[in-house]
Amino acid sequence: VFLDLGSGPLTVPIALWLACPSLRSKKLTFYCLDTSQNALSFGEEIFLSIVAKTYKATPEQVEWNIIRVKGEIGTEIRKKADFITCGNMFNELYWNTSKPLEEISKNYTNLLLSYGNEKTSVLVIEPGVPRSGRFITLLRNSLIRKKMTILSPCPHMVDCPMEGKKGGKWCHFTLLTDKAPKKLHKLSDSAKLSKDRASFSFVFASNVVDSVVEKPVENSKNPQIDIRVVSDPIRLPREKTGRYACSS
């Protein structure tokens, strides 16, 4: 069971169907929650049209069970979720509030986990700007306090060195959009929202750890160090190039 909060036009189910053909043969249930019934309805129409068009490529596919839920975060759903996703939603809720982000992140962590079962996983993605980066860092801290394991992007479970405090560095990632469909670029241009780069901050945490996290070998002469690159190339003295990175 999946739960997509702030689903809009079924953004996550559509993205998963397109990007992960191996999931098309699995009988999955998606609870898609949003305050706009029109967006949910429109998204389901898009999803069904895509399903019809991909049949030749994956004839073994089965139609996923899409359950539309109109409401805000906190609205009850019938089943506990194995996987909770939330993309580009929280910033709409905390952006203009006077409450401290520390308090907000704790409250939303409790709300998120109230939807999940004992083995749930959570993926939250926000725009790659300082305030959102700070929120993601605080959300990460709250998830750790709830005994969740951070699977990505962090290679460690200690304090974030780029915690997004005012005037400081914040953890975010930037991708080029040159491989996006030409029609999408054209649509963005016509809306005067042209983008050649997409920037985002995210955290992926889970209660299911043993099967997905490789445990370090104790007393190893060559201990493995995980490194996560977190910046574009930067110029260094003597015509060298480097990148910022986090390590375990």
Which residues does each predicted region cover?
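C-terminal lobe and adjacent flexible extensions of AdoMet/dcAdoMet transferase-like proteins
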Residues: 173-174, 181-248
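Conserved class I S-adenosyl-L-methionine
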Residues: 2-8
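Conserved beta-strand signature within the Rossmann-like core of class I S-adenosyl-L-methionine
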Residues: 118-126
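S-adenosyl-L-methionine
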Residues: 42-78
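Conserved Class I S-adenosyl-L-methionine
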Residues: 135-155
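Conserved SAM/SAH-binding beta-strand->alpha-helix loop
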Residues: 36
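A short SAM/SAH-binding and catalytic strip from SAM-dependent methyltransferases
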Residues: 82-101
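Conserved SAM-binding loop of SAM-dependent methyltransferases across substrates and taxa
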Residues: 9-25
